Amino acid sequence: VPNEEQLVEYLKWTAAELHQARQRLADLTAALHEPIAVVSMACRLPGKVNSPEDLWELVASGRDAVTGFPDDRAWTFPAEPPYARLGGFVDDPAGFDAGFFGVGPDEALATEPLQRIVLQLAWEAVERARIAPHTLRSTPTGVYVGATNHDYATNLQSVPEQLLPYLGGGTSGSLVSGRIAYALGLEGPAISVDTACSSSLVAIHLACQALRRDECGIALAGGGTVMATPHTFHGFAHQKSLAPDGRCKPFAAAADGMGLAEGVALVLLERLGDARRAGHPVLAVIRGSALNQDGAGYGLAAPNGPSQQGVIRAALADAGLAADDVDAVEAHGTGTPIGDAIEAQALLATYGARRSPERPLWLGSVKSNTGHTQGAAGAAALIKMVQALRHDTLPASLHIDRPTPLATWKKGAVRLLTDPVPWPRRDTPRRAGVSAFATSGTNAHLILEEAPPPGP
């Protein structure tokens, strides 16, 4: 039978163990919700946008990046279906410093433009974070890349024999991420994602989750699409989904279809505490994010309003925030009349309801400038909003005559960004939601917050 002194010692030990267990649980919970720092960004987008600074110039000046089809692609077109030969295109998609990355000329020629551009942007993003790329070799750095539209070799009638060993890997979605990991010697997870138009935001969500679970210490994330053929235009034209003038008119009464485009965008992510300790730039932080699926909705490719509401609420819960803590949403907003109306209703129900009309949710879409960049869309939207935070301005969206009458705007305090709106710093952090939805049914929503002031 223990004496009184032994019992007291046992109780002290039990109390200490309980305190340590509670502390470990608190630390684990905090780690799973730690803000993720955006430490650098890189992009190639329509309108000669070759950097995040170029993207800000594009949206701040209200410039439209839609052009005719590039002459250097030598595209041919069937007579049917007819559609406008207009879209958003990156400059010089074939440009690639193969020797710099140790890629031989035959392998370079057999490698699709998306792999080439993503590899160059990965290097650029690391350098923009003031990190020497060679210092990441053999580190648990992750790569999460949304990759869609692998049409580079689809029109080949025959393949030169010297290219055959490289063509499979050069047009493989899996190697979009794998090639980055190989070239930089990275040993964290390398994952390619294809959920169609939500791919890059899904990849960013997966990278945030991996960082919070300590599966990697730093992560490159984003995605892209580069069209080697006009097949995507043909497909959407058959669906009657393309705008006659090639332009997205998000949430507008005049919306008449999607403007198709291409692009590539990456961000470099790190746990906020690690970024501060390493002295890396902190451009903004990701407070929370979520994914879900449309499931058995109205059709395989049809948007699902309740699912969109669900992913928004899940992202807010992951961030530990309420809807009125968010100032603006960078929407999916492709300019399809029904799709935009469904998205508007979801935003009105989640962000707009019970919100003061004096402080509405501001709504915009970079697709009005660039067109729908497909696999890059979510990452491009994120970069736009990071730049908006840094420039204290919400830029206007283009091609909006008036709000679509297919949405019931009186159900909530949501307003379209038909003009630029000042976004000044204040006592509480400024925040924005970023959405990406897809014909695959996979939805993503992310909560972005301005960078906190440096600690003591």
What are the residue ranges of the model-derived segments?
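Condensing-enzyme catalytic core of the thiolase-fold
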Residues: N3-P456
